[in-house]
Amino acid sequence: MLRPAALAAARLVLRQGRRLLSAAPTQAVPAPNQQPEIFYNQIFINNEWHDAISKKTFPTVNPSTGDVICHVAEGDKEDVDRAVEAARAAFQLGSPWRRLDASDRGRLLNRLADLIERDRTYLAALETLDNGKPYVISYLVDLDMVLKCLRYYAGWADKYHGKTLPIDGDYFSYTRHEPVGVCGQIIPWNFPLLMQAWKLGPALATGNVVVMKVSEQTPLTALYVANLIKEAGFPPGVVNIVPGYGPTAGAAIASHEDVDKVAFTGSTEVGHLIQVAAGKSNLKRVTLELGGKSPNIIMSDADMDWAVEQAHFALFFNQGQCCCAGSRTFVQEDIYAEFVERSVARARSRVVGNPFDSRTEQGPQIDETQFKKILGYIKSGKEEGAKLLCGGGAAADRGYFIQPTVFGDVQDGMTIAKEEIFGPVMQILKFKTIEEVIGRANNSKYGLAAAVFTKDLDKANYLSQALQAGTVWVNCYDVFGAQSPFGGYKLSGSGRELGEYGLQAYTEVKTVTVKVPQKNS
């Protein structure tokens, strides 16, 4: 177990998020194995492991060092075809999966959650090795949310159902909620385990089958979970996992004529491509959770200490690699100077380093491409006239670490105020009135999330209604629960994940009407 100082550090991390997971337990964190053994690096189809048909592999890299962890089978169109064929067979009428009681689907999901909990320490270490996020976060935050998500949807398995309908005439009418069928799911690298759970939970609870493409940057934890899916007792073909690249494996899923639905989390640019491919093929249903440039509005009456800490967390959590990061911090002018001063001090105190060290708050960026992209945005900010207040460069000689960076005097037209940076770069903007900040906050192609910090309930309610965003947090940030839907307006995507709303995208509603001799009330 971690010593008391390490546990205190874990508690500090959780206080920053102030219940990112709605009710994160403060608990002892087992010491990690910093070199976890790699058990699975192949393609998972029909509950079996396969090399890629092409025999190609790709390296997955430790972002803390730049060293190759291992090579992983590189799936492409032929492998996706084989996975879809297996999924389609598992979905045939009369198959073991289709014949399974809804309550038993819930039992399997609960069993999967139990197995993940059993191997939680290993999975947290593997996630940190492959992704770079602090181990304390992997264990206390990501894995906790994974377990809650799977167990939440396990509970829905036998409770999401149709209705009887009192139509006119001598008829009996009712609805059925039926599974869509073969669901293609494409998950990102910033929260590999969590995004896998967000996708699998509602799909499996409602009786679908899955072909999942995992990110080439972070395939390892998803592949380990694949083996737990088999151990839990899911029939062959119900879940198939293909590691590979977006332009090959991802594109094959999006355009496949025998895939009934695709769910994607990632960039808006790729979301466009998936939407087009889905439309050009078989008009498959699409759920997209895309980019954001979320406004975080600090009113002059806000609790300053809390607002500074939460604004810091809103931007820097997960190395800034969050689609809903509070990446436009709007501060009312009469507290602007003090807020900026405190925010810079907080950023300078942020501990960057080895993600397996319990004191670390910030690990590396995911890869060299993102590392260079973020440094390019920092250069752009300086060139366009924003004031660099701290950070601005690499934080280590090895790996993809970037200093916590804060810009002041940011204007709406600057590149760093318009585009998603996806890194530890905070932009602070000044405003005068509520009406002004509403207009500026909504003047974005994105609409994923927003936040308001104020002690005035009228202001909070007014801003919550006015902001064009799928989620608005009041006096908090990044508070998620499996019960609450998440998704975006505008170019931040379509559809919702989590909660009861998250089940809708995975079901078809069928109306059945039966002629009866006589209907009585």
From Swiss-Prot:
One of its GO terms (molecular function) is phenylacetaldehyde dehydrogenase (NAD+) activity. Residues 1-21 form a transit peptide. This is Aldehyde dehydrogenase, mitochondrial. GO terms for biological process: aldehyde catabolic process; ethanol catabolic process; nitroglycerin metabolic process; regulation of dopamine biosynthetic process; regulation of serotonin biosynthetic process. A motif (SIFI-degron) lies at residues 13-28. It is an enzyme of class 1 (oxidoreductase). It catalyses: an aldehyde + NAD(+) + H2O = a carboxylate + NADH + 2 H(+). Gene3D superfamilies: Aldehyde Dehydrogenase, Chain A, domain 1, Aldehyde Dehydrogenase, Chain A, domain 2. The record marks 190 as: Transition state stabilizer. PANTHER family: ALDEHYDE DEHYDROGENASE-RELATED. One of its GO terms (cellular component) is mitochondrion. The gene is ALDH2. It comes from Sus scrofa (Pig).
